[in-house]
């Protein structure tokens, strides 16, 4: 870092200087001096002055007749700072004050979203966060960002904004018109201040949690030693965005950060309207949602005929639908030769041919972007909701699943959504950064222990569930399971006939047997030397039944949708037309 004296010499000799600050490592800011042209050719001397400090430099002419100027910087300032003093200014006070933008070095207009920035960087950051824009860098993600080149790489500019303290949570949602209802918008449906144990995850978290009992301490120590739980800190988080989104898909995968919350909010608003028009009737729809009751009767019929359900999922479509259509098959291709039965038909048709095709192998998850500096409940809940929706879309893309009829399809997904979701966590382990999410849960439980906000029994059940999740995902990752194997494992789980209340259980059992036969054939052809691979994979499925669906909801979804049960949302998703899903299963390839 150049000294003040060196900077002064550069300013005098060249009328142009360069300042390199600690806050802007590798970033150069050009300062054009305010010297009067009439003073050119005169000799300036670095003069000592009473009260001068190492941070001050006085410039004067030999005859002391020139314009005295003082350039100084202060190490306690959060941004580069430049002041000019002249003899003409009253009481030798500062007549010009410059605060430099920490992002690009332009003249700052104040503190915006937690950092001193110019109006340009302020507006750029606000637009990027409000619209959830995703950028990609054409270089090596270390582009120079300054006043003249700040618009060349939006990715590096946004990363620089976040790195220098601009807070995404400080950006408010766009305000609605006055005539619109004052209820929170979908983007505000899940506040970052409301998390499942009421702790703000934006603050740095402790590296190693401690626990009450010795047994819990031993288990947690082994968990951390395995390397699956990582410390939560800014540098660890910031190195990951490149793997969350492929650069060529980045621009086409933009969407709101509250898909599940938007669906629940839309359904709740529809329910309120229905309740107002039928006052004094049965249980309100909103209460039915919270209780998990899905027998809405006429309500379902009305909102489906009016197309309101489809509009309720507009946000989901934006989040999952890209501009490219080549990455997935067209609805006509996917449904060719497959039966489509209306709910309530007495007959069931078994589809000929294989249960799963190559189109069912792809399982592409689009993560919310940009990734926050510290994980919060909104980001975790949104990531989990996208995985849940994608799992349901995958099930609906199977013709044999549609052949079961609407009621059986709903019953199967309601019974086994937790198992499908857990398999999805293992499959998307790296893309979702599940190890960091689980470590966040552990740290939050540790904090609740210190603050005595949770009963020991509840804390123990949550911790055991987290350990089961970690152990299951860890074992699946070690087996190096490919996309075909995950697809067959999900099909075997989905077509389980042992759930009470299912109709035509014989057909469901035949579908499961068909999935097993195709799975066995694939393993034999692909891994001929691994005799026990099929057995090892199938033996992982019983562990899925140990996962408590209620605890999964509390960990991953409660902060986003409150007390609304996943069971109550599933029927609305599955009653959409199958063709609507084929164009939405798209994103970052695993």
Swiss-Prot record:
> Result of mutating residue 208 to A?
No effect on sumoylation
- Ranges where the record places region Required for interaction with NRIP1: 571-590
Q: Where are the zinc fingers (NR C4-type)?
A: 101-121, 137-156
Q: Which residues bind DNA?
A: 98-173
The UniProt-reported impact of residue 238 to A is: Abolishes sumoylation. Strongly associated with PML nuclear bodies. No effect on activation of OCT4 but activation not suppressed by additional SUMO1. Increased binding to KAT2B and reduced binding to NRIP1. Abolishes PML association
Known outcome of mutating residue 29 to M: In strain: CD-1
* Induction (free text): By ciliary neurotrophic factor (CNTF). Repressed by vitamin A. Induced by retinoic acid.
- Cross-linked residues for Glycyl lysine isopeptide (Lys-Gly) (interchain with G-Cter in SUMO) are 238
Q: Main localisation, per the record?
A: nucleus
GO process terms (BP): negative regulation of DNA-templated transcription; negative regulation of transcription by RNA polymerase II; positive regulation of retinoic acid receptor signaling pathway
| GO cellular component terms, semicolon-separated | nucleoplasm; nucleus; PML body
Q: Name one GO molecular function term.
A: DNA-binding transcription repressor activity, RNA polymerase II-specific
Q: What is the effect of changing residue 238 to R?
A: Abolishes sumoylation. No effect on activation of OCT4 but activation not suppressed by additional SUMO1. Enhanced interaction with KAT2B
Outline the segment boundaries, as ranges, of region: Required for interaction with KAT2B: 1-166
Q: Impact of changing residue 361 to I on the protein? A: In strain: CD-1
Compartments where found: Nucleus; Nucleus, PML body
Effect on the protein upon substituting residue 575 to R? No effect on sumoylation
The entry assigns this protein to a family as follows: Belongs to the nuclear hormone receptor family. NR2 subfamily.
Q: How does it assemble?
A: Homodimer. Heterodimer; with NR2C2 which is required for chromatin remodeling and for binding to promoter regions such as globin DR1 repeats. Interacts with ESR1; the interaction prevents homodimerization of ESR1 and suppresses its transcriptional activity and cell growth. Interacts with NRIP1 (via its LXXLL motifs); the interaction provides corepressor activity. Interacts with HDAC3 (via the DNA-binding domain); the interaction recruits phosphorylated NR2C1 to PML bodies for sumoylation. Interacts with HDAC4 (via the DNA-binding domain).
Please give the function described in this protein's UniProt entry. Orphan nuclear receptor. Binds the IR7 element in the promoter of its own gene in an autoregulatory negative feedback mechanism. Primarily repressor of a broad range of genes including ESR1 and RARB. Together with NR2C2, forms the core of the DRED (direct repeat erythroid-definitive) complex that represses embryonic and fetal globin transcription. Binds to hormone response elements (HREs) consisting of two 5'-AGGTCA-3' half site direct repeat consensus sequences. Also activator of OCT4 gene expression.
Q: What is this protein called?
A: Nuclear receptor subfamily 2 group C member 1
| Protein species of origin | Mus musculus (Mouse)
Gene that specifies this protein: Nr2c1
